[in-house]
């Protein structure tokens, strides 16, 4: 059974490992590895930030991955996901996206969730579509062609 909880200070190194995993870096808009010092500052600021929700997903005792949702304007938030390498390809992504999106939108009914995904990231595109996101448009973000997907309250 897939469950989630809010990220805590004890998750800092787990997030550090996930964020620097090779495939995660290659699908990010900033592909350079992240230093531990930079990550620590970022992580501890984010878990305290009232505009950010960081969720750790588990399947029993196994940590599956994380989703981060950040409010960036009055009625807009962006969502991002990463899955532990050994749990990819097991249909966790769309379930995590759907659960986290519903959790956020149930508590923020006037918001739209926005996902910005590299054109080359076919698995993420499929997962977001399966979780109820629709293609809003395409753009070039930091020299990367990407798609903009949106989900609003159902």
Please identify what each model-predicted range represents.
Residues 43-44, 125:
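Short amphipathic alpha-helical segments and helix-helix/interface helices
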Residues 15-20, 39, 43:
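Hydrophobic alpha-helical core bundles mediating ligand binding, dimerization, or RNAP-core interactions
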Residues 1-14, 18-19, 54-154:
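Acyl-donor (CoA/ACP) binding surface of acyl/acetyltransferases
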Residues 21-24, 33, 48, 88:
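Residue-level marker of structural boundaries
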Residues 23-41:
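Conserved GNAT-fold acetyl-CoA-binding loop/helix
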Residues 44-56:
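A short helix-loop-beta-strand connector motif used in the catalytic cores of GNAT acetyltransferases and
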């Amino acid at each position: 059974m897939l469950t989630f909880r809010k990220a805590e200070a004890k998750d800092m190194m787990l997030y550090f490992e996930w964020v620097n995993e090779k495939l995660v870096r290659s699908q990010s808009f900033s592909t350079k590895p992240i230093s531990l010092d930079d990550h620590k500052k970022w992580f501890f600021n984010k878990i305290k930030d009232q505009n950010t929700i960081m969720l750790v997903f588990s399947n029993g005792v196994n940590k599956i991955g994380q989703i981060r949702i950040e409010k960036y304007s009055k009625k807009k938030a962006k969502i991002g996901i990463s899955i532990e390498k050994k749990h990819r390809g097991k249909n966790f992504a769309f379930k995590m996206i759907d659960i986290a999106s519903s959790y956020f939108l149930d508590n923020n009914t006037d918001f739209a969730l926005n996902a910005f995904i590299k054109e080359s990231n076919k698995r993420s595109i499929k997962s977001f579509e399966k979780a109820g996101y629709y293609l809003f448009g395409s753009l070039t973000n930091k020299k990367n062609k990407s798609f903009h997907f949106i989900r609003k309250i159902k």
